[in-house]
């Protein structure tokens, strides 16, 4: 089984959609004030969907099924949030399948800084700009095969890369 990150979608920081924002200067006054207030209240929610691709190798004669996947998001080598994907996904040989993970975290639980610093971090994670940041996703899939369910014995790193501008 091969897993990779396809894309992120629906990236929001304190309810602000980040798709059209590349830097602090792109924020309107109201959004900048909302972020600053969220930081002072120590509640800066970041929500997004990470779309993974799962591919059963083309030379495999048998369909497999992803039954479950435990995952942990790491930012700057810090474990942040964990979750479980529990939707069964059929994995025909050679046909990549979308595995959408809904991820929510409070950035101020894991990082310090100004509203501008934390926006830069969020933009880096979203791949929209900011200084480079290390992002990793560790997962432990459970795959159903003709031999029965197989749980990976060790977590695998699906994504481990530096994101943001260089």
Describe the function of each predicted region:
Residues 1-166:
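Extracellular/lumenal and peripheral-membrane lipid-interaction modules
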């Amino acid at each position: 089984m091969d897993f990779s990150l396809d894309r992120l979608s629906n990236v929001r920081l304190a309810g602000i959609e980040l798709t059209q924002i590349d830097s602090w200067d792109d924020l309107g006054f109201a959004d900048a004030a909302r972020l600053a207030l969220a930081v002072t209240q120590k509640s800066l929610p970041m929500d997004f969907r990470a779309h993974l691709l799962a591919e059963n190798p083309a030379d495999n004669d048998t369909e497999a099924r992803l039954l479950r996947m435990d995952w942990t998001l790491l930012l700057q080598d810090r474990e942040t949030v964990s979750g479980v994907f529990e939707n069964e996904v059929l994995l025909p040989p050679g046909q990549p399948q979308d595995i959408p993970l809904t991820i929510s975290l409070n950035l101020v639980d894991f990082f310090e800084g100004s509203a501008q610093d934390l926006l830069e971090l969020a933009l880096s994670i979203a791949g929209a700009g900011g200084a480079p940041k290390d992002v990793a996703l560790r997962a432990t899939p459970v795959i159903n095969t003709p031999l029965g369910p197989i749980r990976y014995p060790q977590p695998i790193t699906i994504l481990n890369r530096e994101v943001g501008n260089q």
